[in-house]
Amino acid sequence: MRYCYITDPGKVRERNEDSVTILKNGDEYLLAVADGMGGHKNGEIASSIALNHLANRFKEISSVGNKEDAINWIQGTVSEANALIYKYVVAHPESEGMGTTMVLAILTPSFLLIGNIGDSSGYVVKNNKLHKVTVDHTLVNLLVKSGELTEEEAKNHPRKNVLMRALGASNNGEMDIFNVELGVQGIFLCSDGLTNMLDDEQIMKVLNEDIDIEDKLEKLIFKANNRGGSDNISIAYLNKEDN
């Protein structure tokens, strides 16, 4: 089992508003990526509030328990993080509009759960291919589902970054949680700073290379920046088959 995470401001943004972590607690793992928004320091604050709360809660417990316990733990912890961001905005009215996406994974010997809110992506690697698990909470995704836009039109739509759900944006902050089969080769989470620059095949080509896991992530950052690096880029990757 090898794992690694990385974050980079990209080539355009002055600040890095992403937060990322991987934590191990006994034989349980938490991976998470948060992509903050709101301008100035606000996005940075929102993503770090959410991720720090999640990480601290994970460190406090001896185990996430069974699958049902873990789902409840995720929803409860994410709801608390949402409330903390909301509380910050009330105390700092100038930061109104700040929020963050979040994608996370919990891996135990018995189950794998992946959750998301916003447009950061959660994938699994299976048969040396990337399979997207999460569904982006974006306006264009809703329009694709309703048949008003095609997948191709959505890729270049001027409002493709408009989120329908994010932490801090409302009182609820509910996360979608997916129960994923355990028999996967790896877990790959990232912010849209990567997926807006590289497609799934380009990402997988690097993950399949015979180089160290750290070098793979460095190479993905380099490639995304080479294509413009228009946003902050964050990745959390766990390879179950790499010893």
What are these regions (language model features)?
Residues 1-243:
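PP2C/PPM-type serine/threonine phosphatase catalytic domain
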